[in-house]
């Protein structure tokens, strides 16, 4: 517990008065004798000194409160989560496969899958592959559309 200087002076002022008269304001008493005698002090003076001590004890002292400097708190470092990284990698692989997939092309079966799917009967006729559609023209219509576009561009060269 911290004591102020004023509190220490009041404690030294409670000592018995010295035979030599003092002129200091903290040791001088207004109601007591200046010279030490064995005579008891009057009752009124004892009560007033008791009140004086209690009033000084309850007096508010100004305290200087020191707060720490305002420092930005650092958040604890987050541990890397392996499951999140693996999930992100899986999504990236699936996204790349979907992006690079060719539409309309059937994927051939692996040799292990082909042997298990084939019946034990020998195949006499060769297997014909389905007709491959052109990637640019996936419709069953003829290429009249391309000719119409060429004719339009010849008639209207400034259109595009």
UniProtKB/Swiss-Prot annotation:
<dbReference type="GO" id="GO:2000377">
    <property type="term" value="P:regulation of reactive oxygen species metabolic process"/>
</dbReference>
<dbReference type="InterPro" id="IPR024829">
    <property type="entry name" value="IEX-1"/>
</dbReference>
<feature type="glycosylation site" description="N-linked (GlcNAc...) asparagine">
    <location>
        <position position="137"/>
    </location>
</feature>
<comment type="similarity">
    <text>Belongs to the IER3 family.</text>
</comment>
<feature type="transmembrane region" description="Helical; Signal-anchor for type II membrane protein">
    <location>
        <begin position="86"/>
        <end position="102"/>
    </location>
</feature>
<feature type="topological domain" description="Cytoplasmic">
    <location>
        <begin position="1"/>
        <end position="85"/>
    </location>
</feature>
<keyword id="KW-0325">Glycoprotein</keyword>
<dbReference type="GO" id="GO:0046822">
    <property type="term" value="P:regulation of nucleocytoplasmic transport"/>
</dbReference>
<dbReference type="GO" id="GO:0008630">
    <property type="term" value="P:intrinsic apoptotic signaling pathway in response to DNA damage"/>
</dbReference>
<keyword id="KW-1133">Transmembrane helix</keyword>
<keyword id="KW-0472">Membrane</keyword>
<keyword id="KW-0735">Signal-anchor</keyword>
<dbReference type="GO" id="GO:0006096">
    <property type="term" value="P:glycolytic process"/>
</dbReference>
<dbReference type="GO" id="GO:0045820">
    <property type="term" value="P:negative regulation of glycolytic process"/>
</dbReference>
<keyword id="KW-0812">Transmembrane</keyword>
<feature type="region of interest" description="Disordered">
    <location>
        <begin position="1"/>
        <end position="35"/>
    </location>
</feature>
<keyword id="KW-0597">Phosphoprotein</keyword>
<dbReference type="GO" id="GO:0005739">
    <property type="term" value="C:mitochondrion"/>
</dbReference>
<feature type="modified residue" description="Phosphoserine">
    <location>
        <position position="31"/>
    </location>
</feature>
<dbReference type="GO" id="GO:0050728">
    <property type="term" value="P:negative regulation of inflammatory response"/>
</dbReference>
<dbReference type="GO" id="GO:0045732">
    <property type="term" value="P:positive regulation of protein catabolic process"/>
</dbReference>
<dbReference type="GO" id="GO:0006282">
    <property type="term" value="P:regulation of DNA repair"/>
</dbReference>
<dbReference type="GO" id="GO:1901029">
    <property type="term" value="P:negative regulation of mitochondrial outer membrane permeabilization involved in apoptotic signaling pathway"/>
</dbReference>
<comment type="subunit">
    <text>Interacts with the PPP2R5C-PP2A holoenzyme and ERK kinases; regulates ERK dephosphorylation.</text>
</comment>
<comment type="function">
    <text>May play a role in the ERK signaling pathway by inhibiting the dephosphorylation of ERK by phosphatase PP2A-PPP2R5C holoenzyme. Also acts as an ERK downstream effector mediating survival. As a member of the NUPR1/RELB/IER3 survival pathway, may allow the development of pancreatic intraepithelial neoplasias.</text>
</comment>
<dbReference type="GO" id="GO:0007095">
    <property type="term" value="P:mitotic G2 DNA damage checkpoint signaling"/>
</dbReference>
<dbReference type="GO" id="GO:0005634">
    <property type="term" value="C:nucleus"/>
</dbReference>
<protein>
    <recommendedName>
        <fullName>Radiation-inducible immediate-early gene IEX-1</fullName>
    </recommendedName>
</protein>
<dbReference type="GO" id="GO:0016020">
    <property type="term" value="C:membrane"/>
</dbReference>
<dbReference type="GO" id="GO:0001562">
    <property type="term" value="P:response to protozoan"/>
</dbReference>
<feature type="topological domain" description="Extracellular">
    <location>
        <begin position="103"/>
        <end position="153"/>
    </location>
</feature>
<dbReference type="GO" id="GO:0003085">
    <property type="term" value="P:negative regulation of systemic arterial blood pressure"/>
</dbReference>
<dbReference type="GO" id="GO:0006974">
    <property type="term" value="P:DNA damage response"/>
</dbReference>
């Amino acid at each position: 517990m911290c004591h102020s200087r004023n509190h220490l002076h009041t404690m030294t002022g409670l000592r018995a008065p010295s035979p030599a008269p003092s002129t200091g304001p903290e040791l001088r008493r207004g109601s007591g004798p200046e010279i030490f005698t064995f005579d008891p002090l009057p009752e009124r003076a004892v009560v007033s000194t008791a009140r004086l001590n209690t009033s000084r004890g309850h007096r508010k002292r100004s305290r200087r409160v020191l707060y720490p400097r305002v420092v930005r708190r650092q958040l604890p470092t987050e541990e890397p989560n392996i499951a999140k990284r693996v999930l992100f990698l899986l999504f990236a692989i699936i996204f790349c496969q979907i992006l690079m997939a060719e539409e309309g092309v059937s994927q051939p079966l692996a040799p292990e899958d082909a042997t298990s799917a084939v019946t034990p009967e020998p195949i006499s006729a060769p297997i014909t592959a389905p007709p491959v559609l052109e990637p640019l023209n996936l419709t069953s219509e003829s290429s009249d559309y391309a000719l119409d576009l060429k004719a339009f561009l010849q008639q209207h060269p400034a259109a595009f």
